[in-house]
């Protein structure tokens, strides 16, 4: 409920989900936490997280819990709030992001099977917080310039801390922005980037490297910030 933070710890057991996980923390400066083990229980599950940034909570829902699931089932993040995944998750279905999703574990997105999809919707951000996406089996679809939850520098894909690599291909489903925020940090995009007529903007004071082919036919490549871009 609004105005009260939550802490859920499954201990040595697990919490078997039967529907949507909803956190309505509009007036709470604290971060809600789910620890232990979560089972997706035969479906792709939605985490609906509202935004309490006005109350001072940079992260609205922190999930260090291990998220497991049968083959083909994943997670959908909805709502304008920020959710952080820091467990070594074992699900292998699709991941869809609305709002902000932060990754703090190299296995936060689960097991890199060949059928994985990773979609960042419009006005939304996928944030790398000290980790990359090391498998090419996570093709990424970007749909815009990100949201403003992280401040004036935003992106559909944001490298917030560390020298990190996104190994998979990136498809631009709209004109999109990628941010490498901090000096001394580097974001490497190792896969090919495609997008027909859509443009790509690289933003921030961190470095960036495009290791694959940039396959837009008439879209523009724009660079802002003091970081170095290597093609």
Feature-to-residue mapping (PLM):
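Extracellular repeat-rich scaffold modules on cell surfaces
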Residues: 11, 16-18, 25-118, 165-231
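Short, tryptophan-glycine- and acidic/Ser/Thr-enriched carbohydrate-recognition patches
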Residues: 5, 17, 153-157, 164-166
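Short, surface-exposed loop motifs enriched in S/T, G, D/E and P with embedded aromatic residues
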Residues: 137-140, 168
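Extracellular lectin-like interaction modules
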Residues: 4-10
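Residues at the C-termini of beta-strands that transition into short coil/loop
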Residues: 144, 161, 182
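Short, charged/polar, Gly/Pro-enriched secondary-structure boundary elements
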Residues: 55, 134-135
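Beta-solenoid repeat scaffold
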Residues: 122-125, 130-132, 139-156
């Amino acid at each position: 409920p609004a105005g009260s933070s939550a802490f859920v710890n499954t201990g040595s057991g697990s919490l078997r989900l039967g529907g949507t996980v909803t956190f309505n923390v509009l007036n709470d400066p604290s971060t809600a936490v789910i620890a232990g083990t979560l089972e997706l229980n035969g479906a792709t599950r939605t985490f609906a997280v509202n935004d309490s940034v006005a109350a001072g909570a940079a992260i609205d829902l922190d999930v260090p819990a291990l998220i497991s699931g049968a083959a083909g089932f994943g997670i959908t993040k909805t709502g304008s709030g920020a959710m952080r995944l820091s467990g070594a998750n074992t699900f292998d279905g699709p991941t869809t992001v609305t709002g902000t999703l932060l990754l703090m574990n190299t296995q936060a997105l689960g097991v890199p099977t060949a059928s994985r999809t990773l979609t960042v919707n419009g006005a939304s951000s996928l944030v790398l917080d000290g980790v990359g996406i090391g498998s090419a089996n996570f093709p990424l679809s970007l749909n815009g310039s990100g949201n403003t939850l992280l401040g004036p520098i935003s992106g559909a894909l944001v490298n917030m801390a560390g020298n990190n690599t996104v190994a998979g291909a990136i498809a631009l489903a709209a004109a999109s922005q990628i941010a490498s925020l901090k000096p001394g940090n580097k974001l490497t995009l190792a896969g090919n980037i495609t997008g027909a007529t859509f443009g790509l903007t690289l933003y921030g004071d961190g470095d960036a490297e495009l290791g694959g082919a940039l396959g837009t036919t008439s879209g523009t490549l724009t660079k802002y910030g003091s970081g170095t871009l290597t093609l």
